[in-house]
């Protein structure tokens, strides 16, 4: 009744070209706690990377085509940095998502606040789940991320330490990345 429709898909469906992001005005990439995980004490190749190279390419193409992207996840920066062996993932973060990693394990209290920025509609104080419960995943180790391009600004900070929790960019496309 609000006039908006929603389509949900897996990142694999984007990677396998089953879903064309260009068909959508906005994309909300919810990563949650997804990050590269070493399996069987390293006997098996790592899995569950938040931004596999094929997804990076699809998101870059979408953004460069004028798409609007919202990304959230506890390891949104640290997974790109820690799984990067060639520098390509860091370039993707800086050139497409317009952020750089400051640190992992950035906060423990679960509160962010908006800060002065060109984005006047992003305002208020917010809490995210930081305690174990049976209803929702817990953000145990959020990332602090900082702007990495002209036109990118910190829009949220962790209330307990003032580290940057969210970065927004508006240029040829719009992207907002949240480290929680």
Residue ranges and their predicted role:
Residues 1-6, 60, 65, 93-95, ...:
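Carbohydrate-binding surfaces of carbohydrate-active enzymes
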Residues 6-8, 25-31, 63, 68-73, ...:
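Structural recognition of the beta-strand scaffold that forms the well-ordered cores
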Residues 142-144, 153-174:
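Short, surface-exposed beta-strand/loop micro-motifs that present aromatic residues
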Residues 80, 179-180:
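Segments surrounding the PLD/"HKD" phosphodiesterase catalytic module and close analogs
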């Amino acid at each position: 009744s609000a006039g908006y429709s929603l389509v949900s898909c897996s990142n694999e469906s984007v990677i396998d070209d089953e879903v064309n992001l260009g068909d959508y005005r906005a994309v909300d990439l919810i990563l949650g706690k997804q990050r590269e995980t070493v399996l069987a004490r390293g006997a098996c190749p790592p899995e569950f990377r938040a931004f596999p190279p094929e997804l990076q390419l699809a998101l870059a193409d979408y953004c460069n085509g004028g798409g609007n992207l919202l990304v959230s996840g506890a390891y949104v920066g640290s997974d790109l940095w820690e799984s990067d062996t060639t520098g390509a993932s860091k370039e993707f973060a800086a050139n497409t998502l317009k952020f750089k990693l400051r640190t992992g394990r950035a906060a423990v209290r679960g509160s962010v606040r908006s800060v002065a920025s060109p984005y006047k509609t992003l305002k208020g104080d917010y809490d995210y789940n930081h305690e174990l419960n049976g209803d929702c995943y817990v953000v145990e180790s959020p990332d602090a991320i900082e702007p990495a391009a002209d036109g990118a600004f910190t829009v949220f900070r962790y209330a307990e330490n003032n580290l940057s929790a969210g970065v927004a960019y508006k240029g040829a496309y719009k992207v907002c990345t949240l480290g929680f």
